[in-house]
Regions:
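Charged/polar interaction segments and conserved charged motifs
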Residues: 3, 126-130
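Intrinsically disordered, low-complexity regulatory segments enriched in Ser/Thr/Pro
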Residues: 39-82, 131-168
Length: 178
């Protein structure tokens, strides 16, 4: 009888250990660290259906932003990891020497002009520089342009974010956009 109780106790302990190990692995899968983010700039746009466009851009000599590559797009369903990976790719592309005209950018997005494209879309702007990434949620103006909600950077984090953390941060910031 005592052997049965001892055996059951050992079995319960083993099951408890296995369950805890599996739970810890699931927690850590969302926190896998990536290489630090590449210096660059992207604007992230989300429409009413949850479709996300990431537009890589760089600045000209007059400090005007211009798309530096074609937009990257992801449709629902997606995870924070998926969104973070797309933004990471956009940051890499922002360093390209390309410079897309507004016409080419609008054709790639499937719209005639910026005002039409921006209607109903929320936006977050990201700038990664010197191992920091700055986030700014925006307010859409009546002419279709966007302005930062706050002066300066709304949030600054170290550039050593996992795709999950990056995607999660952007999805939370986009909720603040108007």
């Amino acid at each position: 009888m005592i052997w049965i109780v001892a055996g059951l106790s050992v079995l319960i302990v083993i099951i408890f250990i296995i369950v805890n190990i599996k739970d810890n692995k699931n927690c850590k899968t969302n926190q896998i660290m990536q290489a630090p983010l590449t210096d660059g700039n992207v604007s992230v746009f989300m429409d009413n259906n949850g479709k996300i466009d990431v537009i890589p851009f760089n600045f000209n000599k007059l400090k005007q932003g211009r798309a530096s590559d074609f937009p990257l797009t992801i449709m629902k369903p997606y995870t924070q990891d998926d969104v973070g990976a797309l933004i990471r790719e956009g940051l890499k592309l922002s360093g390209s020497e390309k410079s897309l005209s507004s016409k080419v950018l609008m054709e790639a997005l499937g719209f005639f002009d910026w005002k039409d494209y921006s209607k109903g879309r929320k936006s977050v702007s990201l700038t990664c520089k010197k191992q920091e990434i700055a986030f700014n949620s925006t307010i859409r103006r009546s002419d279709g342009s966007y302005a930062f909600r706050v002066r300066g950077f709304e949030k600054v984090l170290p550039a050593k974010l996992s795709n999950y953390e990056l995607g999660n941060e952007v999805l939370n910031m986009i909720k603040l956009s108007i």
